[in-house]
From Swiss-Prot:
Expressed in cotyledons, rapidly dividing root stele tissues, stems, leaves, flowers, mature pollen, and siliques. Coiled coil: none annotated. Disruption phenotype: Plants have a lower leaf carotenoid and chlorophyll a and b content, and are impaired both in root cell division and in root cell elongation. Mutant rsr4-1 can be complemented by the addition of any of the vitamin B6 vitamers, except pyridoxal 5'-phosphate. The gene is PDX13. D-ribose 5-phosphate binds at residues 40, 169, 230, 251-252. The active site is at residue 97. InterPro entries: Aldolase_TIM, PdxS/SNZ, PdxS/SNZ_N, RibuloseP-bd_barrel. Its EC number is 4.3.3.6. This is Pyridoxal 5'-phosphate synthase subunit PDX1.3. It catalyses: aldehydo-D-ribose 5-phosphate + D-glyceraldehyde 3-phosphate + L-glutamine = pyridoxal 5'-phosphate + L-glutamate + phosphate + 3 H2O + H(+). One of its GO terms (molecular function) is protein heterodimerization activity. It comes from Arabidopsis thaliana (Mouse-ear cress). It comes from the Eukaryota. Catalyzes the formation of pyridoxal 5'-phosphate from ribose 5-phosphate (RBP), glyceraldehyde 3-phosphate (G3P) and ammonia. The ammonia is provided by PDX2. Can also use ribulose 5-phosphate and dihydroxyacetone phosphate as substrates, resulting from enzyme-catalyzed isomerization of RBP and G3P, respectively. Also plays an indirect role in resistance to singlet oxygen-generating photosensitizers.
Amino acid sequence: MEGTGVVAVYGNGAITEAKKSPFSVKVGLAQMLRGGVIMDVVNAEQARIAEEAGACAVMALERVPADIRAQGGVARMSDPQMIKEIKQAVTIPVMAKARIGHFVEAQILEAIGIDYIDESEVLTLADEDHHINKHNFRIPFVCGCRNLGEALRRIREGAAMIRTKGEAGTGNIIEAVRHVRSVNGDIRVLRNMDDDEVFTFAKKLAAPYDLVMQTKQLGRLPVVQFAAGGVATPADAALMMQLGCDGVFVGSGIFKSGDPARRARAIVQAVTHYSDPEMLVEVSCGLGEAMVGINLNDEKVERFANRSE
């Protein structure tokens, strides 16, 4: 796709493109996390537990989503000093969250040497109308989506990884399942379209035509797609992998549980062996109490996923 900087092609675990571009490098860095688990941590000790459990990366933040829900207030970028301490404590990549549209928070995170930035709806929005222009940054961005249109709009802005929005901090997987099924369902419809129908479909999605066509040709998103929002058990993680995700984010589900280290190891094993029921039985046994979840049928529960489009 000339001029788009978008890469394709998934094959044998490698992205191939004749012409290298800064965006292709970022997508390649994100693809290195495929098949892994990214864990939310609030201090160096938790980061070390995550690394020892086999996490492929950690997300450094001052409050996990469950605490953001419980405490309320404005949720902002974490203290850079705390992020630096976590970076010094582990050898795996470290991510951090910036508010949607807050490009200065992203500039600060890039300046302290963070490996990936999550432009996150879990934090309070800084701009209701504009996301960050992620092409202006050297490091890869992660963005959430509820459907194919949102995913492709974020990729056009420069997102190198897409995740389901789900409902972070609830321990309830239903919204993450809804979002990944929505994306995959639209891709199945797209694959069966004639090429001359794609223009109308792209217009319906409010997504760039070239990315819609590329998705049709690939049969999947042109960047890695992780599950996030409500993953609390090994079974949840395996479910999202069987639904076609490339990896899993786990936030409150680990360190709000009764035995974080054991649950962290179990979720990593579940992602690795997601299609092996016998292994899933083994890793699901004796984990202690899971995090207390939130019933999303309660109208009083704030929907983080609806904060942006």
